[in-house]
Regions:
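C-terminal helix-rich "cap/oligomerization" subdomain common to oxidoreductases
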Residues: 1-4, 9, 29, 69-71, ...
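Active-site loop of classical SDR/Rossmann-like NAD(P)-dependent oxidoreductases
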Residues: 37, 281-294
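Predominantly a Rossmann-like dinucleotide-binding segment in NAD(P)-dependent oxidoreductases
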Residues: 126-200, 205-209
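Contiguous beta-strand/loop segments that form the cofactor/metal-binding neighborhood of enzyme cores
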Residues: 184-260, 294-304, 337
């Protein structure tokens, strides 16, 4: 096992509790420092979650050479700006999804990787969990036959109006917060099958508080020759993070592909033979965030720079821009050129 990382949090955020605080308790990595706009908030956060101390502002955190990894869990619109600043300081970064606000901004960040001593990974934690790996194995094995269709949902009840996920200037919207998971998951499956993912059409329901922000998006795509239905909503009646892959001989389904630790079932249904058969596999309750942190730690310690993962992140960002254009919604504004 590689040596534990000393991790600094850029932002005392809710998502950091899952991605770093709880995950590091499983992995043994060190919760070293927190920086927030309000030092008192950082101090309270550090005390509550067992961090060694705080830094007086974001700049001081990214300048700290004792840190091995900076985690950026700020609002979407700040991801690219602070990833660039951390890379320019020679830090390695785990940045929450989405990597940037739009494709131009993504490329501005990626260009910094060529000269930085550090690297940047986008926090699509679901892709590290064995449940997702097992779904891909079932599809590739031919057990459900030829690929016939995919249905993926990323739906949740509406957050309060004050939530930054509703802010256009902070790159909010259903696709940025939720739909990016669906697009990234489709690309991951497409890579495993050697098939491209193509957007066919998209339509959006705007948020009532700001018509520039998408509350719900419905999109049709194609993975190879198979049709894909995608639904992403921050105004749903409940939670639905399901991924269903249908073939000529059956289907396989993850009820919660984004957080399999909350529902680790992989359901495989066969329609061949006499009657339908169903098998439920249990993929374990370990956190996808812990799997992600172990992978990033190994990459940091081995100085591994994955062009493949960066490429998938870029294709995800390109699809996000394309969905907005196709649905008639404005592209999220960026802070970089």
């Amino acid at each position: 096992m590689s040596d534990p990382l000393r991790i600094g949090l850029l932002g005392a955020s809710r998502i950091a509790e899952l991605a770093i605080t709880e995950a590091s308790r499983e992995t043994g990595d060190v919760r070293a420092a927190v920086a927030a706009r309000d030092p008192e908030r950082a101090r309270a956060y550090a005390a509550e979650h067992g961090y060694e101390g705080i830094r007086d502002g974001y700049e001081e955190l990214i300048a700290d050479d004792t840190l091995d990894l900076i985690y950026i869990g700020l609002p979407n619109g700040l991801h690219a700006e602070w990833t660039v600043r951390a890379l320019d300081a020679g830090r390695s970064v785990l940045v929450e999804k989405p990597f940037a606000s739009n494709l131009l901004e993504f490329d501005a960040v990626a260009s910094r990787l060529e000269s930085s001593r550090g690297w940047a990974w986008e926090a699509f934690h679901y892709a590290d969990h064995p449940a997702v790996h097992r779904l891909i194995e079932v599809v590739r094995s031919g057990e459900i036959g030829e690929l016939r269709g995919i249905d993926v949902h990323m739906d949740m009840p509406a957050p309060p109006a004050s939530d930054p996920r509703w802010s256009f200037d902070l790159a909010g919207g259903a696709m940025m917060d939720l739909g990016c998971y669906a697009l990234n998951g489709l690309l991951l499956l497409g890579e495993a099958l050697g098939e491209p993912v193509e957007l066919i059409s998209a339509e959006a329901d705007p948020y009532e508080g700001d018509g520039r922000v998408d509350a719900t998006v419905r999109a049709r795509l194609r993975l190879g020759e198979a049709p894909v239905a995608m639904h992403a909503s921050m105004a749903g009646p409940g939670w639905d993070f399901g991924l269903r892959v249908t073939g000529s001989l059956g289907e396989t389904y993850l009820p919660n592909f984004v957080k399999p630790q909350e529902d680790g079932r992989l359901i495989v249904r066969s329609t061949s033979g006499v009657g339908a058969e169903e098998r439920v596999e249990r993929t374990g309750g370990a956190s996808s965030y812990a799997y992600q942190l172990r992978r990033v730690r190994d990459a940091v310690r081995a100085d591994q720079r994955s062009a493949a993962l960066l490429g998938r992140s870029r294709r995800t960002m390109a699809l996000l821009d394309a969905v907005y254009a196709e649905s008639g919604m404005p592209r999220r504004p960026g802070r970089l050129g």
